[in-house]
């Protein structure tokens, strides 16, 4: 029984460490063009918000509008280089396909519904940088809420 409890404890510790590491990671840093987009916008990794900061909404209260805009421009650059955006326009179908591939979501998955809602919420925004950051923030916040509700289930 002690071994079983120890295994549960270790599993919980690893899961917590993994979640903490993910929330500390910078938004967009998993993409191939991350360094290129940072350079194109004369930014360093220190200028980019963390996943945890964005998913919790803290980025909106802890940073100036110019920082928000610059982070959005990096996100737009990444989306455009991956063929998911052209200027301020989404390729919604490609965005869904890439999201499904990246997350392993299946048809009917609430994460896909959240992505669709986030694209709908931001689709009429004209500023491509602000639009991109709002989309990313919306999706990350929805994923955090869904993860919390699944943990409680």
From Swiss-Prot:
Changing residue 39 to I: In strain: Pi-78. Workers bearing only the B allele invariably have a single queen, whereas colonies with workers bearing the alternate, b allele have multiple queens. The two social forms differ in many key reproductive and life history characteristics. GO terms for biological process: response to pheromone; social behavior. Changing residue 43 to P: In strain: P2-35. Changing residue 103 to S: In strain: Pu-8v. GO terms for cellular component: extracellular space. Changing residue 4 to L: In strain: LP-728 and Pu-9f. This is Pheromone-binding protein Gp-9. Keywords: Behavior, Disulfide bond, Pheromone response, Pheromone-binding, Secreted, Signal, Transport. Changing residue 5 to A: In strain: B-26/a, B-33/a, O-70, Pi-3/a, Pi-59 and Pi-72-nmq-15. Changing residue 152 to A: In allele b1, allele b2 and allele b'. InterPro entries: PBP/GOBP, PBP_GOBP_sf, Pheromone-bd_protein_Gp-9. Disulfide bonds join 37-77, 73-129, 118-138. Its main location: secreted. CDD domains: PBP_GOBP. Changing residue 117 to T: In allele b1, allele b2 and allele b'. Changing residue 63 to R: In strain: Pu-39. It comes from Solenopsis invicta (Red imported fire ant). Changing residue 48 to V: In strain: O-40 and Pi-21. It is found in: Secreted. Changing residue 90 to H: In strain: O-88. Colony queen number, a major feature of social organization, is associated with worker genotype for Gp-9. Colonies are headed by either a single reproductive queen (monogyne form) or multiple queens (polygyne form). Differences in worker Gp-9 genotypes between social forms may cause differences in workers' abilities to recognize queens and regulate their numbers. It comes from the Eukaryota.
């Amino acid at each position: 029984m002690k071994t079983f409890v120890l295994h549960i404890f270790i599993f919980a510790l690893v899961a917590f460490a993994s979640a903490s590491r993910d929330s500390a990671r910078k938004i967009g840093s998993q993409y191939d063009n991350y360094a290129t987009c940072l350079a194109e916008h004369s930014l360093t990794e220190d200028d980019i918000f963390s996943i945890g900061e964005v998913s919790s909404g803290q980025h909106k209260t802890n940073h100036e509008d110019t920082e928000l805009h610059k982070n959005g421009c990096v996100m737009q650059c990444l989306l455009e280089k991956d063929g998911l955006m052209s200027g301020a326009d989404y390729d919604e179908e490609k965005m869904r396909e890439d999201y499904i591939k990246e997350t392993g979501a299946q048809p009917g998955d609430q994460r896909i519904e959240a992505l669709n809602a986030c694209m709908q919420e931001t689709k009429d925004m004209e500023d491509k940088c602000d639009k991109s950051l709002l989309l990313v923030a919306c999706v990350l916040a929805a994923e955090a809420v869904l993860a919390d509700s699944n943990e409680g289930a």
